[in-house]
Amino acid sequence: MQLFYVIKADFLRWFGKKNFIVGFISILILNYFIVLQNIEGFKESNIINLVFYYMEDPFYIINFIVVASIMGTSYCEEKESGYFTFWIKRCNEKKYIFSKIINSFFSAFLLLASGMFCWILSLGIMLPWKDNSSDQFQVIIEQGMGNLLKNGHYIQYYIWYCVGVGMMAGVLSTGTFVISLFVKNRTVVIIFGAVLFYLNVSYLQ
């Protein structure tokens, strides 16, 4: 039962709080900033093509750095502030670490999944979902869950897309936290998280 309260206390520290809201807004602004660098290309694009190519942009990784900063670096922050001592007096290290792993995953998952989904939906105000004359659309629908796009189920497709991106963010944020147990410098911890992202992408490719 004590473990449940520790997890709950950590959860209430980030869910709906200032850092989470700022992170959500940062994801929206960041993604718009990246795609609007080529304003002419943006106007002539469509949502499906834009999101597909956007993942190849090197600045895409900043999304993962933003979400990892919510709980992925919490150990470093609590060691610096002395809050770690407060926790250890109330639970053992195993429960502390387990709670942080759970919250590192779900904070990053919820933040990036919701942020990306809202960003993609907002693109619909300015862009069409697809270009029927584009050969690239045929390439995209041959990939995972492409049948949803082919049948016009765009919202369903991007719900699953954002769930996948969110899970990747959760895993990387958890990895960032684990690294922070051994590396005390917060900046170095974040850099390691970025390296994990590139290794993950390279492995998947």
Where is each model-derived feature located?
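Secretory targeting signals
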Residues: 28-74, 102-181, 202
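Helix-loop-helix units of permease transmembrane domains in multi-pass membrane transporters
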Residues: 74-107
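Aromatic- and glycine-rich beta-strand/loop motifs that create alpha-glucan
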Residues: 1-24
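Central hydrophobic cores of alpha-helical transmembrane segments
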Residues: 23-30, 186-200
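Hydrophobic core positions of alpha-helical segments in small-molecule transporters
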Residues: 22-26, 98-99, 107, 111, ...
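Membrane-helix interface segments
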Residues: 18-20, 92-94, 98, 185-190
